[in-house]
Regions:
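N-terminal subdomain of nucleotide-sugar transferases
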Residues: 1-49, 240
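Nucleotide-sugar-dependent
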Residues: 12, 228, 277-286, 293-314, ...
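Acceptor-binding helix/loop patch of EC 2.4 sugar-transfer enzymes
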Residues: 63-67, 117-151, 195
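Membrane-proximal helix-turn-helix segments that form the acceptor-binding/catalytic region
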Residues: 106, 110-114, 127, 144-166
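Conserved donor-binding/catalytic core segment of Leloir-type glycosyltransferases
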Residues: 209-228, 234-237, 249
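A short, well-ordered alpha-helix in the C-terminal region of glycosyltransferases
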Residues: 350, 357, 364-378
Length: 394
C-alpha cells in the first residue's frame, strides 16, 4: 500500500509510525512543513531504513506567522496547494493527515477525493473549536464570524473523511454533536518514541554546556502558544528567585518565549533560562537535566487539546507537574500512573506551592519518575500502535 503520512508540525511520534509502516512493506512518504516554528523530530532517513520510506519537506518563502491571522491564512492556503501537488504527483492509496490547519486540510482532502485516495483525518486538536473560542475572546464581533466558519469547516471535513482517528475518547462527544458517523471513528491515543528518548542523568553534555548540571532544574520543553499560559512559568521564576540553586528552564520559541524574555529583563530574573528549540538528538539530554518537568494548558483548551509533551516527558523517567484541567487525558494519565501532580489551571498559587514542595522532596520525585518510565514502556509499544493504524487503513 502507498501511504502518505502528512504531519504538518514534523513531530517525532508520527515519524516513528511512518518508519514502522515502511518496515511492514508499505511504500511510505512522510510529508511535513519546513516553515512552521515547532519542536520537530529527526526528519530524515536513518541507516537501515527500507528504501520504501521517503521524507518530503514543503517550504514557503517565510516562516508561518502565527500572530497575524490574515497572513497566516494566506500562508496555510499556499502550503495546502503545494501539499495537494505532492499528493497528485505521488498518488498514494491513503493519506493520513494530522496537526494540520483546516484551510490546508480542505485543499488536501479535495485533491484526495479527485484521485479517489482514501483520506484519514487524524485529530490531534479540535482546531475549529479552538479558533472559535480564542477569536471570540480576542475579537468579539468578527471573531465569532471567523470562529463559526472554522467550526463549520471542521465539521464538514470530518463528515467527508473516509476515516477519523481521535487521540482521546473525550473527542467523541463533539463528533456526536456534529453528527459525524460513529462507524468512521477510531480512538488511538498518542505516544512518544521510546527508542529515541533514553533515560539520561543531569550529568550530560547539554546540561554542562548550559551550566545546569549543579542546579535543581524545573524544565518546560515544547510549544508555548495561545492555548498555554506562560505567566505560570514566570510565577515559578519569581518564587524561586532567591533560591540560587534552582533554575527555571524554558525550551521554546515564539510569542510565549518572547514574552518571557521581556519579563526576565524587566524583573531581573537571573534564574530563568530561555532557550530555543533544541535538535531532536538533544531532547533526551534536555529532559534528563530536569528535576521536575512542567506542562501548562489554559482551562478552555482542555476540551480541544491534549498536550503531547506530557507523553514525551514520561519517556524521560522524570516527574512532572501539570497545570491542566483534571478532565484532560494528560491529567488523567499522570494521576492514574502516579507520575506527577496535577493542579487546575486557575490555581496559580497551588501550582507554585507544589513546585516548591516537590523540588525538595527527592523521594517523591524518584518514585514519580519510575512510574513515568514504567507507563511509557507499557503504553508506547510501536508494534501494537502500528497494528491499530493498519486496521484503519484496511
Amino acid at each position: 500500500m502507498r501511504i502518505m503520512v502528512h504531519d504538518y508540525g514534523g513531530y517525532s511520534f508520527p515519524i516513528q509510525l511512518s518508519r514502522a509502516l515502511s518496515e511492514r512493506g508499505h511504500d511510505v512518504r512522510h510529508v511535513y512543513s519546513k516553515s512552521v516554528l515547532a519542536p520537530q523530530g529527526s526528519l530524515q532517513r536513518k541507516q537501515g531504513d527500507p528504501e520504501s520510506l521517503t521524507f518530503k519537506g514543503i517550504s514557503l518563502s517565510y516562516i508561518i506567522d502565527k500572530q497575524s491571522y490574515m497572513k497566516r491564512r494566506r500562508q496555510e492556503i499556499e502550503y495546502g496547494r503545494l501539499l495537494a501537488e505532492e499528493v497528485k504527483a505521488w498518488k498514494p492509496d491513503v493519506v493520513l493527515s494530522g496537526n494540520t490547519p483546516l484551510d490546508t486540510q480542505k485543499l488536501l482532502m479535495k485533491q484526495c477525493h479527485a484521485l479517489e485516495t482514501n483520506f484519514v483525518f487524524w485529530i490531534q486538536d479540535l482546531y475549529g473549536v479552538a479558533v472559535n473560542r480564542i477569536l471570540r475572546k480576542k475579537l468579539p464581533i468578527i471573531g465569532s464570524i471567523i470562529g463559526s466558519y472554522y467550526v463549520n469547516l471542521e465539521r464538514s471535513l470530518l463528515r467527508n473523511s473516509k476515516d477519523i482517528i481521535l487521540i482521546t475518547e473525550d473527542f467523541k462527544h463533539q463528533m456526536k454533536e456534529w453528527k459525524v458517523r460513529e462507524d468512521n471513528l477510531h480512538v488511538i491515543e498518542n505516544w512518544a518514541p521510546l527508542e529515541d528518548l533514553p533515560i539520561r542523568t543531569k550529568q550530560n553534555d547539554w546540561a554542562k554546556k548550559h551550566k545546569l548540571d549543579q542546579s535543581k532544574c524545573i524544565v518546560y520543553s515544547g510549544t508555548l502558544g495561545m492555548k498555554h499560559n506562560p505567566s505560570l512559568l514566570l510565577d515559578l521564576s519569581v518564587r524561586f528567585k532567591e533560591q540560587k540553586d534552582v533554575k527555571v528552564v524554558v525550551v521554546s520559541e515564539g510569542a510565549g518565549a518572547d514574552w518571557l524574555k521581556k519579563k526576565k529583563l524587566e524583573m531581573g530574573l537571573d534564574n530563568l533560562l530561555i532557550l530555543g528549540f533544541q535538535p531532536f538528538d538533544q531532547v533526551a539530554n534536555v529532559l534528563g537535566t530536569a528535576d521536575l518537568l512542567v506542562a501548562v494548558l489554559e482551562p478552555d483548551a482542555g476540551s480541544f487539546s491534549v498536550p503531547s509533551k506530557v507523553l514525551t516527558y514520561h519517556c524521560s523517567g522524570k516527574p512532572m507537574l501539570l497545570s491542566v484541567p483534571g478532565t484532560n487525558l494528560a491529567a488523567k494519565i499522570v494521576k492514574r500512573q502516579g507520575s506527577g501532580k496535577v493542579v487546575e489551571p486557575f490555581e496559580t498559587e497551588e501550582f507554585v506551592n507544589q513546585a516548591e514542595h516537590l523540588i525538595r522532596d527527592d523521594i517523591a520525585l524518584k518514585k514519580m519518575g519510575r512510574n513515568a518510565r514504567a507507563y511509557a514502556e507499557e503504553a508506547f509499544d510501536i508494534k501494537r500502535i502500528t497494528d491499530k493504524f493498519e486496521s484503519v487503513f484496511g
